[in-house]
Amino acid sequence: PFSHALEKVLIPGLHHETLSLLIMEHLNEHFNGQLSTAIAIFTGTYPKPFLHQLISGQLDVDRMDYLNRDSFFTGVAEGVIGYDRILKMLTVKDGQLMVEEKAIFSIEKFLISRRLMYWQVYLHKTVVSAEMSVVLIFKRVLELLQKGVPVQAASTDLDFFLQNREAGAAIKQHLDRFCRLDDHDVMASIKNWCHHPDKVLSTLSRLVTERKLLKIRFLKEPIAASRLTELRKETALRLTISEAEAAYFVFTGKASNTTYNPKDERIHILFKDGTVKDISEVDNALINYGSSLAFGEISKEYICYPQAQ
């Protein structure tokens, strides 16, 4: 539910790709091994590496799909890429996925579009505020449950994972439960928690359901600890909660994104003479080693705090 936002909250330590593999293996047993090839491609053990690179790599079809799709639904034109040309220019050499040199500019446009979409959509300050609010709601729920305070989710499946934190270690036994979860389980629970006697939980839940999100401000430099403490004291007084509880409403964080790092996975350009270069090593490269686009994640510190009444 809620994609990556709750990934580390519902089942700590379980990456979504690990969960995907467990589901595929479960289905493979049900279909008597018919997914064995698909699993080998997914895990990168299939003898043709380019197939894995097509579904999990710098130029995988998922990235091409979500950039155009999200660009359309959000109205942010910068995410539109010429995926059809990129697909036509894809080729294979020595089992590795490569791109013909004619598509260099299309690849550079793809990388720049991804960078712009992250800062204009995925890491937009309103998105960050909403996501952090939902995460903190579940953090508070887990804290209350640990203290013995009753908190019930709107569905038995979500309730199961919140009440049984050890279930994540035995997730293979509970895949059916997990696969029944969706965004509705989460939102229905948050609506119910708007009326919970715990003030922190009910207030956070109302912020989300009523769309009165925490204000967020990106900072040029980290905020002083004394100033953060001061803001929490002010919030504690205004909401009549403790200073420790005010940390749920006044907190700092960091939004980060890396456009392209050849140390992770490379985008190989195949030239007519048969030579192969990384996209960052071509002549007059837009994505080059000296550019902030190539290396080093771009990070922005932020602070969240309640809106003035």
Please report, for each region that a protein language model flagged, where it lies by residue.
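Histidine-centered, transition-metal-coordinating active-site segments
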Residues: F2-Q309
